[in-house]
């Protein structure tokens, strides 16, 4: 099959993305702050015949795949295909009905707690705490992951700067624009430098970061 490239007129959305740094030659503050990860042969995430049943309903049926270190891997499918259920099993939030899975070499059946500390998870529906302010959500995430006091302060300050949250710190997440809600959720997921990051529909409503 042959591939042809053709120039098309610019759209309003293209100019908007370009102004935000998401166009050709644009820079990403987030990418600049994250350490580069080289592709390797080590397996970061693997599952074999992973299945989840809710009574007579099978949400995921014998899912198998491997994700190597440094690889970006996506799950595609219509609503109800089991993508979020698969994520939740890999994050240790749901117990599989059958099959096995490993994250960074840890068996989910035996080391669920340890696995949770080695990954970041940005849920499809916001996993933010509405009764807490933006700052308190960041502080809570840092505390949950057991960061020491000095590291906690440094990481919170870095996340505020990286995701441009400085003007929203005293506001409740529910009062934020959708894009800033997404920024806050991603900041919380990245707080502890996780080697594995699960993103469930992360680009909905978000602008380039």
Feature names for model-found ranges:
Residues 3-52:
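ABC-family P-loop ATPase nucleotide-binding domain
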Residues 45-209:
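ABC transporter nucleotide-binding domains
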């Amino acid at each position: 099959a042959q591939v042809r490239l053709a120039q098309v007129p610019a759209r309003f959305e293209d100019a908007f993305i370009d102004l935000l740094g998401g166009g050709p030659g644009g820079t990403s503050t987030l990418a600049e702050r994250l350490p580069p990860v080289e592709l390797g042969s080590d397996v970061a995430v693997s599952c074999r015949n992973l299945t989840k049943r809710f009574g007579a309903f099978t949400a995921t049926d014998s899912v198998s795949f491997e994700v190597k270190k440094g690889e970006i891997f996506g799950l595609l499918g219509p609503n109800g295909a089991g993508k979020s259920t698969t994520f939740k099993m890999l994050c240790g939030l749901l117990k599989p009905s059958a099959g096995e899975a490993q994250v960074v070499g840890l068996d989910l059946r035996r080391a669920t707690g340890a696995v949770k500390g080695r990954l970041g998870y940005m849920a499809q529906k916001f996993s933010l705490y509405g009764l807490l302010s933006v700052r308190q959500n960041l502080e809570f995430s840092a505390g949950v992951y057991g960061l020491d006091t000095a590291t906690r302060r440094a990481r919170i300050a870095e996340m505020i700067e990286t995701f441009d949250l400085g003007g929203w710190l005293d506001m409740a997440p529910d009062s934020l624009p959708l894009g800033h809600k997404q920024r806050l959720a991603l900041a919380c997921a990245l707080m502890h430098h996780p080697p594995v990051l699960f993103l469930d529909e992360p680009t909905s409503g978000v602008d380039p970061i």
